[in-house]
Amino acid sequence: MASETEVKIRAAVTKALNTSAAFNRKLKNPFRRHMFLTGIHEPMAEELSLDHLEVSGEIPETLVGTYARIGPNPYKPDPRGHHWFVGDGMVHGIRLAEGSAEWYHNRYIKSGTLERNGGPPAAGGPRRGSRDTVNTNVLKLAGKTLALVESGPFPFELDRNLDTIASVSYTHLTLPTT
């Protein structure tokens, strides 16, 4: 449970960020494209499943497993008020086995926030607060693949194909889980 001081600080910071974003959204669109919505920061437009990837060179047969990374990928970004830390979580992964690249998948974390932004339906599970975007870290813990964020929402469990199963609560933890 957050302390009274923490609640007041979060409320003040949230109000300031929302006020700043609202101001930015009223500005006319700039002549140039938004720096965090182009180039290497440009959001992926869709989820992909690519199988039996072509490999240049060799992958050692002993290198087996899934490499996954996560980051913000706004579903419907507003270029007038976008910050690159803020964005729906998207996990990317590549599965290696027997000297081959079996697949590449990228998947949105099926949060309630993503659903409210017009994305696919949210996965089940407990929530802490109305904003449940996770977009900072992905790790394996006790046999589960978890997507996390440092700001407070519960982690989301992912299956072996990186699809969202549900949010997960470790009830004895009252602070962020990363």
Where does each model-flagged region fall?
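Short, glycine-/Ser/Thr-/acidic-enriched flexible segments
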Residues: 74
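Intrinsically disordered, low-structural-confidence terminal and linker regions
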Residues: 1-47, 51
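Structural signature of eukaryotic scaffold interfaces centered on beta-propeller domains
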Residues: 124-141
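Conserved small/polar residues in nucleotide/adenosyl-binding loops
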Residues: 171-177
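Entry beta-strands of beta-propeller and related beta-repeat scaffolds
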Residues: 144-145
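Beta-propeller domains
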Residues: 41-45, 55-63, 77-126, 148-170
